[in-house]
Structure formats: C-alpha cells, structure tokens
C-alpha cells in the first residue's frame, strides 16, 4: 500500500472518530495522537526518504493537506463541543424573568430632617433666607451679641461646652443671626432669615433632654415691625405644622435677646383644646419662644434701634416631631432602631 493510500485511509478513519467525540479532553487526546511528533502523519513524512525525487513532493504536499483537513475537522468539533458546554450552562442557569425580584430597601430622610425640610420650605415660601453657621462658635457671637455679657446671670441658664475661653460648641443658632445682622445692607431691603442646625448643651440625656439637639431660629428686621407681625407669622407656621384649625396664644416670658418676650402655645391638636394627657388637660401645648428683638442686640450689630425693629423666634424640630407624632423619648431619634425609624419613611 502506497503512502497516499495510507494517508487517505487515516483521514477517513479518524474523520468519523473525531465527529463522535463527546468531550474536549478526549478531542485533545486525539489531536496529540494524530498530529503530534509521534503521530502517523509525522511517521509518513519521515518515510518519504525512501521515495523517489519525483514522488517526494507529491506525497509531501498530500500529507500536509491531510494534516490540515484533520486539523479543520478537529477545530470544527471543538467549536461544537464548546457551544454545547455553553448551552448546557445557560440551560442550568436560566432566569425566569417573570419571577418577582427581591425588594431593595431604599433610604429615606430621617424624621428630624423631614421636619426641618418642611419648616425650611414653609419659611422660604414667605421670603426667608435659610442660613447656616459654624457649630464651633465664638463666645462673642454666641453670647455677647445676644445681649448676654460675660457677667450676665442668664449664662447660668444653659451650661455650655467650652473649647477655649473664647471658643465653644454653640448653644443656640442665634450666632448666625448676629453674623448676618453685621453684614446686611438694609438699604437693599429687610432681613428675613431662619438659621437651622445642631446645638450643644451640657444636659444629662433623658427622655426629654439631649446634649445635642436641633434648633431653628428665625429673625425679621425692618422698619415698622410689630408684635402683630410676629403673631401672624407664628400662627401660620403652627397651622402649617399642626393643622389649619390650630390657634395660638402668647404668654409673657423672659429671654435676654428679646423685649418683650413670649412663650407661644398652640391649641392641642389631640383633643382640640378640650383637655387630654398630651396638653396636661389645659388645652394648650407650649411649642416655642419668641419676642421683639432687644435694642441692645440691634445696637451690637450697628443697627439703629430708633429706625429698625424686628422679631425673633426659636423652635426645636426635635420637639415638633415628638409632639406631631406622639413620641415620648427624644433618644429614639438618635438610635439605629429601624423598627422605629421606618415608621416615618416618605413614600414616592
């Protein structure tokens, strides 16, 4: 049997075998056996030394063709087997797109943030600026410009976290009002602002007190400002937060930075003023302090107190949230208990 005939038979025998191979490993073994250095085609090429000079090129070319044809068959089968592996994997990992997905919990603003955002939006609608200031504040702005000099007995009303003799953790957001009054150009219009933020006092933490809490103070300065302007503003704000049927009353009080000063009560939104545990059976709930800006505060900011006047108020968003949602422990706001916090999630 001549070499060409052997090569043809080799191709026919292995062509069928290759097409029936079931795995890539088995196919690789056949590749090595047929096309490797010890394979039959290599053996045929080595035997060409016994051929005549005329036969040698023909047989060599035919042997190379058979090797290329077998390589092509092997590559074709390899592609089929690889595709079969992919198809099997896809079949085993099929995703049913009609199945409901696992819900992803979305974040939501904290209840205090919601209250503050709501109040800020209300006052911005009335033309107020929202201005924030540093939490590490100068004694000068925190106390002295608020008519509370170093020897003033009112400093005993709130213990303060001092960093140095002149630097402290602000105990109120009023310092931003002082900073703004110093710079405001009243020839361009009145000053209307709120200053929300975190304040610090050396209180023992309990159900109604915290060493760190939120405050929002408001200030209006212009010519011809009266107590009626203050009352109308606070009535609109209380009706916005606690319900349109609410009324308010003003009781005389004392704050160093306002004169006259008042405590503001809102009619109880739980009992409608009839008396209940929330309002301690009085029909009224204390919600904030306010008053007309003290002339000394205006003068400290180089504002002519004979020409300009104004009103100021301060409220606690934490207290507003407690009252509005019936929460009896301020510490609940500062825990990571999702059972509590998710009750106030905003939808949409």
UniProtKB/Swiss-Prot annotation:
Biological processes annotated in GO: phenylalanyl-tRNA aminoacylation
Superkingdom of source: Bacteria
PROSITE patterns in the record: AA_TRNA_LIGASE_II (PS50862)
E.C. no: 6.1.1.20
Cofactor(s), names only, from the UniProt record: Mg(2+)
Secretion signal, residue range per the UniProt entry: none
GO cellular component: cytoplasm
Subunit structure: Tetramer of two alpha and two beta subunits.
Stated name of the protein: Phenylalanine--tRNA ligase alpha subunit
Source lineage: Bacteria, Bacillati, Bacillota, Bacilli, Lactobacillales
Gene: pheS
């Amino acid at each position: 049997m001549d070499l060409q005939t052997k090569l043809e038979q080799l191709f026919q025998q292995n062509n069928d075998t290759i097409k029936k191979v079931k795995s890539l490993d088995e196919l690789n073994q056949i590749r090595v056996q047929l096309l490797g250095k010890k394979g039959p085609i290599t053996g045929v090429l080595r035997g060409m030394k016994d051929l005549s000079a005329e036969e040698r090129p023909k047989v060599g070319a035919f042997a190379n063709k058979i090797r290329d044809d077998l390589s092509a068959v092997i590559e074709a089968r390899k592609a089929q087997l690889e595709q079969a592996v992919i198809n099997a994997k896809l079949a085993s990992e099929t995703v049913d797109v009609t199945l409901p997905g696992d819900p992803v919990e979305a974040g939501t603003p904290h209840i205090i943030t919601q209250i503050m955002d709501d109040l800020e939006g209300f006052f911005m609608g009335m033309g107020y600026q929202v201005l924030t200031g540093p939490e590490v504040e100068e004694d000068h702005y925190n106390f002295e410009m608020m008519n509370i000099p170093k020897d003033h007995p009112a400093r005993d009303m709130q213990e303060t976290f001092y960093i140095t003799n002149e630097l402290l953790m602000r105990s109120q957001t009023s310092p931003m009002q002082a900073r703004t009054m110093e710079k405001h150009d009243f020839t361009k219009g009145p000053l209307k602002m709120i200053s929300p933020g975190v304040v610090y006092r050396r209180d023992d933490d309990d159900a109604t007190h915290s060493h760190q809490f939120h405050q929002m103070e408001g200030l209006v300065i212009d010519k011809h400002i009266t107590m009626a302007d203050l009352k109308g503003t606070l009535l609109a704000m209380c009706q916005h937060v606690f319900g349109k049927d609410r009324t308010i009353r003003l009781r005389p009080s004392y704050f160093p930075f306002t004169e006259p000063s008042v405590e503001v009560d809102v009619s109880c939104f739980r009992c409608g003023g009839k008396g209940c545990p929330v309002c301690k059976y009085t029909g009224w709930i204390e919600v904030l302090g306010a008053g007309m800006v003290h002339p000394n505060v205006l003068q400290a900011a180089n504002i002519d107190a004979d020409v300009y006047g104004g009103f100021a108020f301060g409220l606690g968003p934490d207290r507003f949230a407690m009252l509005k949602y019936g929460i009896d422990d301020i510490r609940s706001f500062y825990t990571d208990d999702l059972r509590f916090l998710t009750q106030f999630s905003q939808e949409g």
